Amino acid sequence: YNIQKESTLHLVLRLRGGMQIFVKTLTGKTITLEVESSDTIDNVKAKIQDKEGIPPDQQRLIFAGKQLEDGRTLADYNIQKESTLHLVLRLRGGMQIFVKTLTGKTITLEVESSDTIDNVKAKIQDKEGIPPDQQRLIFAGKQLEDGRTLADYNIQKESTLHLVLRLRGGK
């Protein structure tokens, strides 16, 4: 290795259960992180902040199409070595809205005012598995049209939309 006197060596401890995972950003950049299966999503966001300077509250991590929750661990999501997570930035101006189903269940969504109704239906599909073409969204008594934005309908943070299912074959 041609190590000469007074050289400095660096000792890197590889923790038991330590592994590398990759985080891909929307710009296509890939970040490599050293993690353990027992790390929480919070921990992972903190490591991304250390490397990239992005505050954790602006980070959304996606794996296998699911948004990862802060308190859960990598092991909970079966994220193994060399898995790739996707990092989506939650822009300032992001907000939560609620979607209430006819069964009385309430779904919380992270959205932006500029999101279209299409986008919102796609988020509902991610969370609930309901295809967008079966979803009808109602706010303040009005049915919401796909191409319009939340801002168009003056839907603000913590607004509640109502989800009605359009059954196949129904008009």
Curated annotation (Swiss-Prot):
Glycyl lysine isopeptide (Lys-Gly) (interchain with G-Cter in ubiquitin) crosslink residues: 66
InterPro entries: Ubiquitin-like_dom, Ubiquitin-like_domsf, Ubiquitin_CS, Ubiquitin_dom, Ubiquitin_ubiquitin-like
Pfam families referenced in this protein's UniProt entry, alphabetically: ubiquitin (PF00240)
Superkingdom of this protein's organism: Eukaryota
Cytoplasm recorded as keyword: yes
Propeptide segment residues: 171
All residue ranges annotated as the Ubiquitin-like domain in the record: 1-18, 19-94, 95-170
Main location: cytoplasm
GO molecular function: mRNA binding
Alphabetical keyword list: Cytoplasm, Isopeptide bond, Nucleus, Repeat, Ubl conjugation
Record keyword Transport present: no
SMART domains in UniProt: UBQ
Location in the cell: Cytoplasm; Nucleus
Cross-link (Glycyl lysine isopeptide (Gly-Lys) (interchain with K-? in acceptor proteins)): 94
GO cellular component terms attached to this protein's record: cytoplasm; nucleus
Family indicated by similarity: Belongs to the ubiquitin family.
Further remarks about this protein from its record: Ubiquitin is generally synthesized as a polyubiquitin precursor with tandem head to tail repeats. Often, there is one to three additional amino acids after the last repeat, removed in the mature protein. Alternatively, ubiquitin extension protein is synthesized as a single copy of ubiquitin fused to a ribosomal protein (either L40 or S27A) or to an ubiquitin-related protein (either RUB1 or RUB2). Following translation, extension protein is cleaved from ubiquitin. For the sake of clarity sequence features are annotated only for the first chain, and are not repeated for each of the following chains.
Function: Ubiquitin exists either covalently attached to another protein, or free (unanchored). When covalently bound, it is conjugated to target proteins via an isopeptide bond either as a monomer (monoubiquitin), a polymer linked via different Lys residues of the ubiquitin (polyubiquitin chains) or a linear polymer linked via the initiator Met of the ubiquitin (linear polyubiquitin chains).
Protein name, UniProt field: Polyubiquitin
